[in-house]
From Swiss-Prot:
Function as written in the Swiss-Prot or TrEMBL entry: Responsible for synthesis of pseudouridine from uracil-13 in transfer RNAs.
Alphabetical GO biological process terms: tRNA pseudouridine synthesis
Catalysed reactions, as listed in the record: uridine(13) in tRNA = pseudouridine(13) in tRNA
Keywords per UniProt: Isomerase, tRNA processing
Organism classification: Bacteria, Pseudomonadati, Pseudomonadota, Gammaproteobacteria, Pseudomonadales
Organism annotation: Azotobacter vinelandii (strain DJ / ATCC BAA-1303)
Protein name: tRNA pseudouridine synthase D
Recorded GO CC terms: cytosol
EC nos: 5.4.99.27
Residues covered by the TRUD domain: 157-303
SS bonds (residue pairs): none
Length: 352
């Protein structure tokens, strides 16, 4: 499947040019932002790890082997891509045990930068945000138009699509999810089950968001919407008064779309009509998610870009720095700016 089929239309029109992303790992740097004070004592050893050429699961397996402990004793907040230079936290459960010797885990692809004890393990999704530093090379673009587009993104945000990596190579995860949904079965292997359920859920969300981008109301609240703050999982219904809330213009409050689960859409008015229509079109996937025990949740439709800054180290290089909430994709920001040369089509996720 193509990018436009898996995501949807751009919000701001045609790209301002072309560029290459991820010519090397240093071109895509991700730092996990964790808002948890670590106590310095407890039965969990937290590790601040820098890795390149390894995804999060591979790094966890390496730490487990070096520590001589089962993989289930290793925890992390979010999944980071292999094709990047990333820094993130892991925790090791060591009740009554000394810190293990982890020298065997380290080489040029993995370095342990910090070790801290804490009383609790690191929970999935516990990080607050991810900081990105991206370097786009082989840039061929209209620089004034690119600068104007960046200012627009700073003021208005971008559609909060799930990025391409969620769906696997050529949408393979989604195709596999459809096959399981038709058979009304679930994969026995836990990681595969999680990956396919996430792909299906993400695709349905993207379908709804794509429809709203196409008509231009993805970033505007309307009666019947369910609204949520940027960093909150709770939501509330929008009436006429809520649609005039000044926090919408400040990019603190946003309309949301469905993360599919059991039951129908709790939205109202035109929003419910749209979400129900997508649900009918994709009934096998929607039913499969409900039968798998997924609960209906919401995700903001608009992605605010915090601390956005950019400069041009060379005439054909654009360097971007910004912070995104956990669970959001840096390349959905990039796709509103430029088309990527083929070597840069891989995406990097934050966390499911």
């Amino acid at each position: 499947m193509s990018e436009s089929e898996l995501l949807g239309p751009r919000a701001y029109g045609e790209a301002c040019g072309q560029a290459l992303l991820k010519a090397c790992a240093e071109d895509f740097q991700v730092d996990e932002v964790l808002d948890i004070p670590l106590s310095g004592q407890g039965e969990h050893l937290w590790l601040w790890v820098e890795k390149r050429g390894l995804n999060t699961e591979e790094a966890a397996r390496r730490l487990a082997r070096a520590a001589g402990m089962p993989l289930k004793a290793i925890s992390y907040a979010g999944l980071k891509d292999r094709q990047a230079l990333t820094r993130q936290w892991f925790s090791l459960h060591l009740p009554g045990k000394a810190d293990p010797d982890l020298v065997a885990a380290e080489d040029d692809s993995l370095r342990i930068l910090e070790r801290v004890r804490h009383s609790r393990k690191l929970q999935r999704g516990a990080h607050a945000a991810n900081g990105f530093k991206l370097r786009l090379t082989r840039l061929a673009a209209d620089r004034p138009a690119l600068d104007a587009r960046l200012e627009q993104l700073r003021r208005q945000g971008v559609p909060n699509y799930f990025g391409l990596q969620r769906f696997g190579h050529d949408g393979g995860n989604l195709a596999e999810a459809r096959a399981f949904a038709v058979r009304r079965e679930l994969p026995a292997q836990r990681n595969l089950r999680s990956r396919l359920l996430s792909a299906a859920r993400s695709y349905l969300f993207n379908r709804v968001l794509a429809e709203r981008v196409a008509v231009g109301d993805w970033n505007r609240a309307q009666p019947g919407d369910l609204l949520a703050f940027t960093d909150s999982r709770s939501f509330f219904p929008a009436g006429v008064e809520e649609c005039a809330d000044p926090r919408l213009a400040l990019l603190d409050l946003h309309p949301t779309g469905p993360l599919w689960g059991a039951g129908g859409s709790p939205a109202g008015a035109a929003t419910k009509v749209l979400e129900d229509a997508v649900g009918r079109c994709e009934a096998p996937l929607g039913d499969w998610l409900g039968e798998a025990g997924m609960l209906h949740e919401r995700r903001i439709l608009r992605l605010p870009i915090d601390r956005l800054a950019w400069h041009y180290p060379a005439i054909d290089i654009l360097q971007l720095e910004f912070v995104l909430p956990a669970g959001c994709f840096a390349t959905v920001v990039v796709r509103e700016l430029v088309d990527l040369w083929p070597a840069g089509l891989m995406d990097t996720s934050c966390v499911f």
